[in-house]
Design a protein with these regions (language model features):
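N-terminal carbohydrate-binding accessory modules
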Residues: 2-116, 500, 504, 509, ...
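Substrate-binding cleft of secreted/luminal carbohydrate-active enzymes
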Residues: 345-432
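Aromatic- and acidic-residue-enriched segments that line the glycan-binding/catalytic groove
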Residues: 64-79, 132-144, 177-195, 408, ...
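Short, solvent-exposed turn/loop segments enriched in Gly/Ser/Thr/Pro and often Arg
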Residues: 121-125, 173-180, 394-400
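Active-site region of glycoside hydrolase catalytic domains
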Residues: 31-32, 178-332, 339-362, 386-389, ...
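C-terminal functional modules
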Residues: 402-405, 409-552
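Short amphipathic alpha-helices and their capping/turn segments at secondary-structure boundaries
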Residues: 38-48, 103-113, 157-162, 286-293, ...
Length: 552
């Protein structure tokens, strides 16, 4: 895994330089008109909320450095799922592992520390129990019996997550023929996904089948399940060139659109090959063909994996320097996240870090004390919380009886070892208060905070000649404050966990669709959209501050 983060070569500007000096002011005596007149629907806050999650790594797609026991009777080289399938007693070994690796105990513990999402890595062969034809023409064709029980466990996991108020990101970790050279892509053979048209077609079928199976399963539940937030089309793809992957991505999205049963498909998550700038520019330009819903769009999310322990440069850098680089707002890391978040947000999408850890080379550690790792974790969290729609730590745990505790990689070990915070996100101390008294209190807070923010905004821009519509700032502030409160009060599955807007740029873009003052006739953002956007973000942050003070 080559985890290299390159900065952008160009700056994505919020707006063009104004050519005229026109100003639209608001009377402080007249409350601004909000554009977001309806509260967020349940489907909205589930997909757009901040996802703070953990990968359930080595549950279905197995990795020997995480869990050794299932590999002990595998065929040589005993490093991949296919090797296990070829070995002795594979069916019994795998089903025992699936039934014991993540249990009610783990679900309860994850919820107790504020985790509200899980990412589940799957191989296409794990779907064969519901669609036997998915194995046709693939390496796993002879092993239907071994894997036929996986799909039932996967759907049980979706139900278990829902009971704890958690969303699920489904990740195609292993595609037919392997999309990268690592053994966690299903086999120990060389990667041959992108070089073989047959495998590319089988990969499209896998996405179609996965989408259909997920949607029909969720719709079959009473009430229907809404906690599938996204389908990640490929994990860490390593194409020979970008063109072949980008064409496949567009074709795969078309399969999602056709296969999803119902009106609202989940978000599309795209691995960006550690070429964040390039894939941001491309996905923004191609947003219409990448969005999961052909009529009204939806979320398109780039997935960046950030590790600092694999390259020679990383292993020769101290953890203190890694931490400083993350916190430096002028560094390539922060700038890249900011520019990607803002550019994709304007299109209707965002960025996440779906794999990260505090795994470090021994050469990077100085004191070998928990605090230096904790500082590194805190720095990462600060960046991801600021710019990303979500994050998922890699991974829940390692096989302790074999490998012992590992605070660098095992999430449970990291929390218990003080390397990761004991809880993340807002945790409610009081229940939802919909009384008239609370509405009046909240209205007073909004009015006071909005006026102060508006005065500062107007004063700052009064020094710079240009065309402005400050009324939009006030309207945005109002919408941001009210919408974030709607997210706070929208969660009902977990009495302590609190939802909040995660993909802010994308959510603002959704709220602006069809509003003449904010959107041009061709669907692009209007001249003064940036003022609404700035106001919305400030209002949302003010709501978070107020909610934390009053309810947490």
């Amino acid at each position: 895994m080559r985890k290299v983060f390159r900065g952008f070569k160009q700056d994505f500007l919020h707006r063009s330089k104004p050519e005229s000096d026109t100003r639209t002011e608001s009377s402080s005596a007249t409350p601004p008109t909000p554009f977001a007149t309806t509260p967020p629907a349940r489907d909205d806050w589930i997909q757009y909320r901040k996802h703070r999650g953990v990968n359930l790594g080595s549950w279905f797609v197995l990795e020997r450095w995480i869990t050794d026991t299932p590999f002990r009777q595998a065929a040589q080289p005993a490093s991949s799922d296919l090797d296990i399938a070829k070995g002795s007693n594979a069916k019994a070994i795998l089903e025992k592992h699936w039934d014991t690796w993540v249990t009610t105990k783990e679900w309860n513990w994850l919820a107790s520390v504020g985790i509200n999402s899980v990412r589940i890595p799957l191989g296409y062969y794990h779907l064969c129990g519901a669609d036997r034809s998915i194995l046709d023409g693939t390496d796993f064709y002879p092993y239907y019996d071994v894997y036929q029980g996986a799909w039932k466990r996967i759907t049980d996991a979706i139900i278990a997550a829902n009971k704890k108020g958690m969303t699920v990101l489904i990740d195609l970790h292993a595609a037919p023929g392997k999309q990268n050279a690592d053994s966690h892509s299903g086999t120990s053979n060389p990667a041959n996904f992108f070089n073989d048209p047959h495998n590319l077609r089988r990969g499209l079928y896998a996405i179609s089948s996965l989408t259909r199976l997920l949607s029909t399963f969720c719709a079959s539940q009473d009430p229907p399940l809404k906690n599938i937030i996204g389908i990640e089309l490929l994990n860490e793809p390593a194409p020979p060139d970008d063109d072949v992957l980008r064409k496949w991505y567009i074709d795969a999205v078309a399969e999602v659109r056709k296969a999803w049963v119902g009106s609202r498909a989940p978000a599309i998550y795209l691995g960006e090959c550690w070429r964040t700038e390039s894939y941001t520019e491309w996905s923004t330009a191609e947003y219409g063909r990448l969005a999961p819903n052909s009529t009204w769009g939806g979320l398109v999310v780039l997935d960046h994996h950030l590790y600092r322990c694999f390259t020679p440069a990383d292993t020769q850098t101290s953890v203190q320097d890694h931490t400083r680089a993350l916190l430096d707002e002028t560094s390539g890391i922060q700038k890249t996240f900011q520019q990607t978040s803002e550019s994709l947000g304007r299109a209707g999408g965002g960025i996440v870090v779906a794999e990260w850890s505090c795994g470090l080379a021994p050469t990077s550690l100085r004191t070998h004390q928990p605090q230096e790792r904790r500082d590194f974790v805190d720095a990462q969290l600060a960046v991801y919380e600021k710019w990303c729609g979500g994050w998922w730590w890699w991974m829940l745990k390692k096989e302790e009886s074999v490998y012992g505790k590992d605070v660098g990689w095992g999430f449970k070990d990291a929390v218990e070892g003080g390397v990761f915070p004991s809880s993340v996100g807002l945790r409610r101390r009081r229940g939802v208060d919909r009384s008239q008294r609370e509405r009046e209190r909240r209205s007073r807070v909004l009015e006071t905070e909005r006026k102060q923010a508006y005065d500062q905004h107007r004063e700052y821009w009064s020094r710079i000649p240009g065309s402005y519509n400050h009324v939009l700032f006030e309207s945005g502030y109002t919408d941001g404050f009210n919408d974030n409160y709607a997210f706070f009060e929208g969660v009902s599955l977990d009495s302590e966990g609190v939802s909040e807007i995660g993909f802010r740029g994308a959510w603002i873009r959704e709220r602006a669709r069809g509003v003449g003052e904010l959107e041009n006739a061709d669907g692009s953002v209007g001249e003064h959209y940036w003022e609404y956007e700035h106001g919305f973000k400030q209002g949302a942050e003010a709501a978070r501050t107020d909610f934390a003070k009053v309810f947490c």
